[in-house]
Amino acid sequence: MGSQGSPVKSYDYLLKFLLVGDSDVGKGEILESLQDGAAESPYAYSNGIDYKTTTILLDGRRVKLELWDTSGQGRFCTIFRSYSRGAQGILLVYDITNRWSFDGIDRWIKEIDEHAPGVPRILVGNRLHLAFKRQVPTEQARAYAEKNCMTFFEVSPLCNFNVIESFTELSRIVLMRHGMEKIWRPNRVFSLQDLCCRAIVSCTPVHLIDKLPLPVTIKSHLKSFSMANGMNAVMMHGRSYSLASGAGGGGSKGNSLKRSKSIRPPQSPPQNCSRSNCKIS
């Protein structure tokens, strides 16, 4: 956990996360999609290890993440046991187009329970842009996550969908577990950055943030701020985040979305992806 004291630091908290799962589930794709991340490993040896850092904004606080991806091959289980020491959060990653990778999550949970017991974890279904090849139903994965007390996300690095949001949610879980609510005083004076973020996300649905004429890093911060503060709740379904959940909102949530759109100038229909070569079925 990072400290708050030193003014030379460019972050308020430092967290170490592990991405675990079978090989070829796209963990490297998730890391590569973090455009503001640094890829240099602080250690001389990196065989079988991918490392990247990125900084997210969580309720106005800068959280630096050290992200470690150990190869999913069996011979790297020893490496996982070594790197699990000091880990504060774990992302269990599977490929929604590969049933075998989902069935293998049980084995990874056993490894985690043995070598990193009590560490917060979330379940991540990767490659949502290949939903037309889906072998793992969303509802089955969500039920599995709830059974194992995990938050569930379906993500697409290619479409920049839910990647930052998944890291933000895991960061919030970790920091809350370490008593973050005692550090963050509810009557603190909001910074200009906080006020600007609140002003923008209060009148912009989260799925339209990508259409704003802003740099990618700022748009990522806005989406993280929105998710961290429970704003734009029409994009949420329980504690799960996926394309399927976006279609389920109704009642007062649907009305709030209509009110948000009514005060904005006419816009073209929202697109699911920010990249032209991506299509989610």
Swiss-Prot record:
InterPro entries: P-loop_NTPase, Small_GTP-bd, Small_GTPase, Small_GTPase_Rab, SOCS_box, SOCS_box-like_dom_sf
Chain spans, region Disordered: 245-281
Cofactor entry: Mg(2+)
This protein's GO CC annotations: endosome; plasma membrane; synaptic vesicle
Its EC number(s): 3.6.5.2
Keywords: Cell membrane, Cytoplasm, Golgi apparatus, GTP-binding, Hydrolase, Lipoprotein, Magnesium, Membrane, Metal-binding, Nucleotide-binding, Palmitate, Prenylation, Ubl conjugation pathway
Membrane topology field: Lipid-anchor
Enzymatic reactions: GTP + H2O = GDP + phosphate + H(+)
Domain SOCS box: 175-228
Binding site for GTP: S23, G26, K27, S46, G72, N126, R127
Localization annotation: Cell membrane; Cytoplasm, Cytosol; Golgi apparatus membrane
Family named by the database record: Belongs to the small GTPase superfamily. Rab family.
Notes concerning its domains: The SOCS box contains two defined motifs including the BC box that recruits and binds Elongin BC complex, and the Cul box which interacts with the Cullin family of proteins to form a ECS (Elongin-Cullin-SOCS-box protein) E3 ubiquitin ligase complex. Switch I, switch II and the interswitch regions are characteristic of Rab GTPases and mediate the interactions with Rab downstream effectors. The switch regions undergo conformational changes upon nucleotide binding which drive interaction with specific sets of effector proteins, with most effectors only binding to GTP-bound Rab.
Function: RAB40C small GTPase acts as substrate-recognition component of the ECS(RAB40C) E3 ubiquitin ligase complex which mediates the ubiquitination and subsequent proteasomal degradation of target proteins. The Rab40 subfamily belongs to the Rab family that are key regulators of intracellular membrane trafficking, from the formation of transport vesicles to their fusion with membranes.
Protein name per UniProt: Ras-related protein Rab-40C
